Amino acid sequence: MTKERDKFCIIQLSDLHCGDSRFDKALVDNALEEINSKRPDLVVIPGDLTADGYRDQFEEAREYISQIACPQVVTVAGNHDCRNVGFLHFEDLFGSRNKTVDFDFCVYCEEIFQEKVKVVAVDSNKPDLNDGEVGRGKYDRIREQFRGKNDYKIFVLHHHLVSVPGTGRERNIVWDAGDVLMELRKVEVDLVLAGHRHVPYIWPIAGMLIINSGTVCTWRTRGYTKPSYNIIEISATEIDIQIMMPGGEILNRERYSRVHPKKRLPLDK
């Protein structure tokens, strides 16, 4: 039996855009050092590893990602990765664009028994388009993979399911967002992790926390938004989310009840 622990740590980082003119290696180096110091249980990278989907850009991204010291790293493709038929290079270097992983959770909660972490990651891209769609062909897989009653359920995709403030005219929510949200609600998903628009934000909706990450290592930012990644720590009673700029600055922090995710907790510690 795996030993219980106080917290389960997830690092969420996305939109590396290797090959972009505004890519900043110093941000990558700082992020890698900070991430490895946290010794995360899971790292989720929801897309846009590259600027244009070229193989050398994927190889550069793989070099950085290989330096992450974590037994579980889940990577999905973004819209930039699918440019120039880049999804073929993604599959060569990172495997399937649709993934499922599960492993021991071991953070005991008196009110909710959750024994395993189940991560279901899907490709939401339309090649050479910025728009996305999960697609009805994947709904059965979502239902099947999330059928367990005692799993902590995490859904990963690149595109947004809900609009994100500060991103201008929102055109990049997946085409079937409403249907996807309904499916996730029915199977009682706990977390939805996405990237795409370079603005981090947290939405508590229908018992889920929908957490978007910014761009971790480019200056392709909007307004006063800074490069960032997310630290998500799950304890027996709460979910603590910190939005971090590589280099150590905490840009935002929010806490939610694990039992009642729509209930936001005060930052009293």
What annotation goes with each model-predicted range?
Residues 1-66, 141, 148:
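N-terminal active-site segment of His-dependent metallophosphoesterases
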Residues 59-141, 182-185, 230-231:
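Extended active-site neighborhood of metal-dependent phosphoesterases/phosphodiesterases
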Residues 169-240:
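Conserved beta-sheet core of the metallophosphoesterase superfamily
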